[in-house]
């Protein structure tokens, strides 16, 4: 027996149908393409946001897009260090990482957070595989070199950040193999150096390097703000390098947004078609950005 739809619900049903139709050209455009997603920020600690993120990733794979997830975990590392009685020191936003801290960071990133994300995706029917930059020589790191001015003399001096690294080479073979076999790679930001040491890498930087090496169609950087804002607080939805340089010069782009924007520019320079900075706390923000004309963040392109 056929059941008739409740007439009062028809507007909602039609709106959903219109959304699906609106998505059609984007589904056709992005089928078979690779999207690299940097997952981090406070959304990682919110159970509803975790599920929203996992749903987005599983949906992308289901419609023929190849998502590659690279995650952070700074707050979780900090919490574990505090629990273990290990004090943290930061220089220029980077955690000074001695041998004990490096061991804890790898444990939290590769052993805990990585497998939690794999579990969320698996719980929704996705086939996720958790790896780190160490696996199959995915990422080769080298020690970050930093300097700062001495407060009294003004003379630049070297700052030893310990086992903090930056990617110098990426071999994306394992990621290509996993996506081709219908898996969703989930990557923890730790990697080996040529010296055999394990380095903790900023997740934004690592995700951008992986996106460039894969020639990804899109690089999504999920954070805790709507994107790049102008001085009145309004979202800037579309930026190229010239616009970014001007916004940095007049101090519109400042502070922690500078390295995020620079990571996106570097990814685009390396071959990514476009990068997007968007608020990971907004439910299904990626889907709004990908499949609607309205978008949901700041698109950075050549």
Curated annotation (Swiss-Prot):
It is found in: Cytoplasm. The record marks 38, 260 as: Transition state stabilizer. It is an enzyme of class 2 (transferase). Pathway: Amino-acid biosynthesis; L-arginine biosynthesis; N(2)-acetyl-L-ornithine from L-glutamate: step 2/4. HAMAP family: ArgB. The gene is argB. GO terms for cellular component: cytoplasm. It catalyses: N-acetyl-L-glutamate + ATP = N-acetyl-L-glutamyl 5-phosphate + ADP. Catalyzes the ATP-dependent phosphorylation of N-acetyl-L-glutamate. This is Acetylglutamate kinase.
